Amino acid sequence: MTAILERRESQSLWGRFCNWITSTENRLYIGWFGVLMIPTLLTATSVFIIAFIAAPPVDIDGIREPVSGSLLYGNNIISGAIIPTSAAIGLHFYPIWEAASVDEWLYNGGPYELIVLHFLLGVACYMGREWELSFRLGMRPWIAVAYSAPVAAATAVFLIYPIGQGSFSDGMPLGISGTFNFMIVFQAEHNILMHPFHMLGVAGVFGGSLFSAMHGSLVTSSLIRETTENESANEGYRFGQEEETYNIVAAHGYFGRLIFQYASFNNSRSLHFFLAAWPVVGIWFTALGISTMAFNLNGFNFNQSVVDSQGRVINTWADIINRANLGMEVMHERNAHNFPLDLAAIEAPSTNG
């Protein structure tokens, strides 16, 4: 009797790479999205650190008045920022090889565009990696859906808004004070505080914080005691235990009596869906608001003051907001134009004689 033994062909290098990339046994899951995420985020992070420390001033307004943003050029952690790409570049794709020299690339703010584009690609891949890992583990996909809210917000301020305004110089600077400067200028030019989508975003963020604090405090206050009074209550929990760690009936009864019965969830699953959905939907609306205001579909304005029967102005809060917006706009790019855009756009009165 003859036995035929087949030699098992060794798996190709590509096959082993595919198995390693998609293995859920790795300490950190990589996935196919991770193949793109890792180099893009490493590039964005490396260039950000180097530029924040040592980048030379950038001609952000395109008027040959460079603005310094790095630590070595006089800034500190609060005032430092990666200055957006120059208005002279506009929306042009501006990699290093498009500039005549590295000095020119730095002067025109090339690092900002490099960081932003790599960062957005990286966080989008991170979101895809969340979905990919959930899929391979047999989980539902809602973690990636929740993460889409900050991804949408980042895309709105770093990409959609510059596209709508016609230049990457209008993007948000990458720094603490630069972020606040962006917010102030955005209010001056678009009246974002009077935009309903921004209001929904505020409700989402602050409401989410409130609900998170309420949920955490209710759970912590209704733990099922498994320890003595001399031990921490946290020691009564063992990772993976099947038993409930808190009494949802007690928490439901407390909150129902504190407010009213139907203000309290009696279903843990619907409760946690609500905790996730509220801030996510709010931030989605904020990102949508930024994206619409990018194309100058601005917040409500009340430029026509209320007047009485004699034609005298009755001052309202709207008048104060309008004056504040004009003041902020005057301070913005003060050397690029002499008047706020709202005033400069008004047709000059005709004169006779």
Swiss-Prot record:
<feature type="binding site">
    <location>
        <position position="170"/>
    </location>
    <ligand>
        <name>[CaMn4O5] cluster</name>
    </ligand>
</feature>
<feature type="binding site" description="axial binding residue">
    <location>
        <position position="198"/>
    </location>
    <ligand>
        <name>chlorophyll a PD1</name>
    </ligand>
</feature>
<keyword id="KW-0359">Herbicide resistance</keyword>
<feature type="binding site">
    <location>
        <position position="215"/>
    </location>
    <ligand>
        <name>Fe cation</name>
    </ligand>
</feature>
<keyword id="KW-0007">Acetylation</keyword>
<dbReference type="GO" id="GO:0005506">
    <property type="term" value="F:iron ion binding"/>
</dbReference>
<keyword id="KW-1133">Transmembrane helix</keyword>
<dbReference type="GO" id="GO:0016682">
    <property type="term" value="F:oxidoreductase activity, acting on diphenols and related substances as donors, oxygen as acceptor"/>
</dbReference>
<feature type="binding site">
    <location>
        <position position="342"/>
    </location>
    <ligand>
        <name>[CaMn4O5] cluster</name>
    </ligand>
</feature>
<comment type="subunit">
    <text>PSII is composed of 1 copy each of membrane proteins PsbA, PsbB, PsbC, PsbD, PsbE, PsbF, PsbH, PsbI, PsbJ, PsbK, PsbL, PsbM, PsbT, PsbX, PsbY, PsbZ, Psb30/Ycf12, at least 3 peripheral proteins of the oxygen-evolving complex and a large number of cofactors. It forms dimeric complexes.</text>
</comment>
<feature type="propeptide">
    <location>
        <begin position="345"/>
        <end position="353"/>
    </location>
</feature>
<protein>
    <recommendedName>
        <fullName>Photosystem II protein D1</fullName>
        <ecNumber>1.10.3.9</ecNumber>
    </recommendedName>
</protein>
<feature type="binding site">
    <location>
        <position position="215"/>
    </location>
    <ligand>
        <name>a quinone</name>
    </ligand>
</feature>
<keyword id="KW-0106">Calcium</keyword>
<comment type="similarity">
    <text>Belongs to the reaction center PufL/M/PsbA/D family.</text>
</comment>
<dbReference type="GO" id="GO:0016168">
    <property type="term" value="F:chlorophyll binding"/>
</dbReference>
<feature type="modified residue" description="Phosphothreonine">
    <location>
        <position position="2"/>
    </location>
</feature>
<keyword id="KW-0464">Manganese</keyword>
<feature type="binding site">
    <location>
        <position position="333"/>
    </location>
    <ligand>
        <name>[CaMn4O5] cluster</name>
    </ligand>
</feature>
<dbReference type="GO" id="GO:0010242">
    <property type="term" value="F:oxygen evolving activity"/>
</dbReference>
<dbReference type="GO" id="GO:0009635">
    <property type="term" value="P:response to herbicide"/>
</dbReference>
<feature type="transmembrane region" description="Helical">
    <location>
        <begin position="197"/>
        <end position="218"/>
    </location>
</feature>
<dbReference type="Pfam" id="PF00124">
    <property type="entry name" value="Photo_RC"/>
</dbReference>
<feature type="modified residue" description="N-acetylthreonine">
    <location>
        <position position="2"/>
    </location>
</feature>
<comment type="function">
    <text>Photosystem II (PSII) is a light-driven water:plastoquinone oxidoreductase that uses light energy to abstract electrons from H(2)O, generating O(2) and a proton gradient subsequently used for ATP formation. It consists of a core antenna complex that captures photons, and an electron transfer chain that converts photonic excitation into a charge separation. The D1/D2 (PsbA/PsbD) reaction center heterodimer binds P680, the primary electron donor of PSII as well as several subsequent electron acceptors.</text>
</comment>
<feature type="binding site">
    <location>
        <position position="272"/>
    </location>
    <ligand>
        <name>Fe cation</name>
    </ligand>
</feature>
<feature type="transmembrane region" description="Helical">
    <location>
        <begin position="274"/>
        <end position="288"/>
    </location>
</feature>
<feature type="binding site">
    <location>
        <position position="332"/>
    </location>
    <ligand>
        <name>[CaMn4O5] cluster</name>
    </ligand>
</feature>
<keyword id="KW-0157">Chromophore</keyword>
<dbReference type="InterPro" id="IPR055265">
    <property type="entry name" value="Photo_RC_L/M_CS"/>
</dbReference>
<keyword id="KW-0460">Magnesium</keyword>
<feature type="transmembrane region" description="Helical">
    <location>
        <begin position="29"/>
        <end position="46"/>
    </location>
</feature>
<dbReference type="GO" id="GO:0045156">
    <property type="term" value="F:electron transporter, transferring electrons within the cyclic electron transport pathway of photosynthesis activity"/>
</dbReference>
<feature type="binding site" description="axial binding residue">
    <location>
        <position position="118"/>
    </location>
    <ligand>
        <name>chlorophyll a ChlzD1</name>
    </ligand>
</feature>
<feature type="site" description="Tyrosine radical intermediate">
    <location>
        <position position="161"/>
    </location>
</feature>
<keyword id="KW-0934">Plastid</keyword>
<dbReference type="InterPro" id="IPR000484">
    <property type="entry name" value="Photo_RC_L/M"/>
</dbReference>
<dbReference type="InterPro" id="IPR036854">
    <property type="entry name" value="Photo_II_D1/D2_sf"/>
</dbReference>
<feature type="site" description="Stabilizes free radical intermediate">
    <location>
        <position position="190"/>
    </location>
</feature>
<keyword id="KW-0812">Transmembrane</keyword>
<dbReference type="InterPro" id="IPR005867">
    <property type="entry name" value="PSII_D1"/>
</dbReference>
<keyword id="KW-0604">Photosystem II</keyword>
